[in-house]
Amino acid sequence: MAKYTEEQLYEIKEEAYTPQPDVLDAFNKMVDHVKEHAAAEFEKHKNLKWSNGDTYIDENGNERPYHHMNKRRGSRSGNKPNLRKKSTDGIKVDDDGWATLTKPKKSFGAEDGVEERNKFRESVKDIKVKPNNKNLGSSKAVDPRDAIAEKHTNTFNAFEALGDGDDSDDE
């Protein structure tokens, strides 16, 4: 299908031939009528969405639907403002213009247990835990008894069974 610009269509408009102008006028009237009908249907359905047909007469004598009284309070529908103040004491701007927030974290007794914490970390550094590899890929919880002590299992050794001929019934 050929595509034309708006200017080309306006240039061709004078040369265009409409064989039956009364048919074209009737078609345009029908299109306008359908547009009006569609707008009226939209308004009707829009009003039905918000009301069940109940109305009342207000103090000025106007008939109004009840739906405006069923709205939620304005304080519950909007976003709440952020009332926290942003502190500017920990912002450090470097020579490139980047601003970094360097705020020390607050902790209770941070200086009190530094040497105890370092001593504990040194003592725990050498402890190795053997994981239970059969459950690593699953979401199933690991049994703590398997991680603590590996259970001894009696296994069948084929080489011992073949190499030892004394147990057979050769008597």
Curated annotation (Swiss-Prot):
Pfam families attached to this UniProt entry: CAF20 (PF17052)
Where does this protein reside within or beyond the cell? Answer: Cytoplasm
* Keywords annotated in UniProt: Cytoplasm, Initiation factor, Phosphoprotein, Protein biosynthesis, Protein synthesis inhibitor, Translation regulation
Q: Which GO terms describe its cellular component?
A: cytoplasm
Q: Which domain of life is it from?
A: Eukaryota
Q: One MF term in GO for this entry?
A: translation initiation factor activity
The cross-references to InterPro entries, in alphabetical order and at most eight, read: Caf20
Residue segments, region Disordered: 49-144
In what ranges is there compositional bias, type Basic and acidic residues? 86-95, 115-129
Which GO terms fall under biological process for this protein? negative regulation of translation
Provide the primary localization: cytoplasm
Report the function annotation for this chain: Acts as an inhibitor of cap-dependent translation. Competes with eIF4G1 and EAP1 for binding to eIF4E and interferes with the formation of the eIF4F complex, inhibiting translation and stabilizing mRNA.
Q: Which family does it belong to?
A: Belongs to the CAF20 family.
Protein name stated in the entry? Cap-associated protein CAF20
